[in-house]
Structures are given as structure tokens and as C-alpha cells.
């Protein structure tokens, strides 16, 4: 369980198994969630990555979020399965990562006893299922019969499927993607432009004149003078 702040919006991280009590210090309990949720005010973001857990504990957390006065944005970055999917339904807006999954199924329990006890357990599970359908119905607007059918089949949904069925509202976008692409494109375009300009400049620039070297083509001056002197005294 973690709590963080992001641009003035409080951020809660619901990461782990949902339980009524914490045994291994990595479970999320209603008491822990309540302490963090009401430690401040304003809009919140709840990141969820949980395989589920106790449906009663999940119901308590779901109710807290539904009753919260601020805006609640749920972001699923990994898995929102079983009881965790119920909590996700409390979001004013539910967003999923492109790689995230959401799973819904029928509630399960362990019962010991005679046939009468088994029948009581079955009746209890039926009522628990109806209560879970309530949360799904409020969020999705799907019929109870369709939701019940999806739960019977243990339905796994990627982001697109969850949006199609109304369990999610959108896909999380990478805020860095557009900026990065712009920078890369600008860099690439600048590099090409600079390369072209360098070529044009190098071709259009006047070539430096080379100094002409005077190479002797005949007799040197000194030799000529010597010859003149020799003739003078003949």
C-alpha cells in the first residue's frame, strides 16, 4: 500500500491482495484504505494492481470511494481481478493501460457441514453475486442477465474489451510519447537541413586562390650577369 501526491491531486496505490485484516503486511484492508483516503481532501487518483481478495472488504472500499466527495479517477496499470474489479467500478473515470487486464467471475467460498449447510452457502453466494452485479450494473449499464453470464464464464477483458462493455472509460496514454516524437522529428529534420545547407555552402563558396609559383624557365639572373661581366672584359 502506498500513498503519493501528483500535481496537487492525491494519489493512492492499491497494490496487493484485498483482505479484512493484514497478516503479511502486504494486504490492503478497509481500515488502512480509510485512513489514507480521508487523510486529505480534493480529487484523487487510485492506481489498481490487485488479484482481488475478500469481497466484503472490497465492498467496504468500493463504498468509501462512491461516498467520497472529490473526483475519483481509477487507473488500472496491471490487473484488476475479482474483488479488485468491484473497487474499480467506483471510479468517476476508469482508465486502463494498454497491457492491463480486468477479470470478473462468480464469488467463491469454502463451506463445511451437511447438506443444509451447503444450501446455506449456496444461497449466500447467490446473494453476494447479486450485490456484485449491482456495482457492475451501475457502472456499465449492461443488463443483469448479461453481467451474470459474463461472471459465469469468468471473463477476462483487455482495455479495449473493457471499454466496449462499459467496465472502463478509456486507455491510459503515455504522456511522454507525443513530446518524444516531436523532439526526435525535430532533431532528424534539423540534421537533414544542416547537412544539406553544409553541402550547398561548400559548393557555392569561392575556392581560395592558389599562389602561382614562379618556376624558372631559363638562365638565372645571376648566371646572366656573370655572362655579361665576362663579355664586358673580353
Question: Where are the predicted features?
Answer:
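N-terminal organellar transit peptides
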Residues: 1-83, 91-234
Amino acid at each position: 500500500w502506498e500513498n503519493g501526491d501528483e500535481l496537487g491531486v492525491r494519489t493512492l496505490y492499491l497494490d496487493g491482495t484485498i483482505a479484512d485484516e493484514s497478516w503479511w503486511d502486504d494486504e490492503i484492508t478497509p481500515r488502512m484504505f480509510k485512513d489514507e483516503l480521508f487523510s486529505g481532501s480534493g480529487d484523487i487518483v487510485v492506481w489498481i494492481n490487485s488479484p482481488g481478495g475478500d469481497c466484503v472488504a472490497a465492498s467496504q472500499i468500493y463504498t468509501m470511494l462512491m461516498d467520497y466527495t472529490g473526483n475519483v479517477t481509477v487507473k488500472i496499470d496491471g490487473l484488476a481481478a475479482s474483488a479488485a474489479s468491484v473497487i474499480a467500478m467506483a471510479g468517476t473515470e476508469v482508465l486502463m493501460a494498454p497491457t492491463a487486464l480486468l477479470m470478473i467471475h462468480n464469488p467463491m467460498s469454502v463451506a463445511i457441514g451437511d447438506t443444509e449447510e451447503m444450501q446455506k452457502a449456496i444461497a449466500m453466494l447467490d446473494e453476494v453475486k447479486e450485490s456484485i452485479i449491482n456495482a457492475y450494473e451501475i457502472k456499465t449499464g449492461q443488463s443483469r442477465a448479461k453481467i451474470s453470464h459474463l461472471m459465469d464464464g469468468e471473463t477476462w477483458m483487455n482495455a479495449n474489451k473493457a471499454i466496449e462493455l462499459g467496465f472502463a472509460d478509456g486507455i491510459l496514454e503515455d504522456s511522454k510519447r507525443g513530446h518524444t516524437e516531436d523532439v526526435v522529428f525535430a532533431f532528424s529534420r534539423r540534421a537533414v537541413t544542416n547537412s544539406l545547407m553544409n553541402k550547398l555552402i561548400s559548393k557555392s563558396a569561392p575556392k581560395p586562390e592558389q599562389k602561382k609559383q614562379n618556376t624558372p624557365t631559363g638562365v638565372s639572373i645571376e648566371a646572366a650577369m656573370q655572362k655579361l661581366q665576362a663579355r664586358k672584359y673580353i
